[in-house]
Amino acid sequence: MKIQLIAVGTKMPKWVEEGFQEYRRRFPHDMPLELVEISAGKRGKNADIARILQKEGEAMLAAVPKGNRIVTLDIPGKKWDTPQLAEQLEAWKLDGRDVSILIGGPEGLAPACKAAADQSWSLSALTLPHPLVRIVMAESLYRAWSITANHPYHRE
């Protein structure tokens, strides 16, 4: 199973790239983690936010390979602790499809992305900076994998 993070935003600071790559490298070959960056729409004083969200959503959905399970990161989504995320990872593997996880921009996700989702996940009740979410996602997914593989990374 391949896990694909599709995130709005490009040209992240070096610390974000290094943090993400640190965890991406650790994934096993049979479960690679891939990052697809979508250009954020230009936001300004008189920006049409609804139109920007629509364009970002179209680009995100176009990046999802046909047949993939779509999981959105959204505040009202399911809240999983680490063992529950490990259970989700196992369920996704058994489903036989690759997984695309959509991370919206500053205004969140387009309605079309939410409508296309098979599942919605709330990473935290906190508002997190979008660059940091990439690292938190990579680490959380790696930790969940480590539980399923009985790897010593996760400790109770």
Swiss-Prot record:
Function, as annotated:
Specifically methylates the pseudouridine at position 1915 (m3Psi1915) in 23S rRNA.
Query: Any idea which UniProt keywords this protein has?
Result: Cytoplasm, Methyltransferase, rRNA processing, S-adenosyl-L-methionine, Transferase
Lineage top rank: taxon: Bacteria
So what EC number does this one have?
A: 2.1.1.177
Q: Which GO terms describe its molecular function?
A: rRNA (pseudouridine-N3-)-methyltransferase activity
Answer whether the UniProt record assigns the keyword Signal to this protein: no
Compartments, record wording: Cytoplasm
Q: Name one GO cellular component term.
A: cytoplasm
PANTHER family, per database record = METHYLTRANSFERASE, RIBOSOMAL RNA LARGE SUBUNIT METHYLTRANSFERASE H
The gene behind this protein is rlmH
Q: Name one Pfam family in it.
A: SPOUT_MTase
Name the top EC class. Answer: transferase
Q: Please indicate if the UniProt record lists Methyltransferase as a keyword.
A: yes
Its protein name is: Ribosomal RNA large subunit methyltransferase H
The record lists the catalysed reaction(s) as:
pseudouridine(1915) in 23S rRNA + S-adenosyl-L-methionine = N(3)-methylpseudouridine(1915) in 23S rRNA + S-adenosyl-L-homocysteine + H(+)
Query: What residues bind S-adenosyl-L-methionine, as annotated?
Result: L73, G104, L123, S124, A125, L126, T127, L128
What organism is listed for this UniProt entry? Answer: Vibrio parahaemolyticus serotype O3:K6 (strain RIMD 2210633)
Binding partners and assembly: Homodimer.
Q: Which InterPro entries match?
A: Alpha/beta_knot_MTases, RlmH-like, tRNA_m1G_MTases_N
Q: Which family does it belong to?
A: Belongs to the RNA methyltransferase RlmH family.
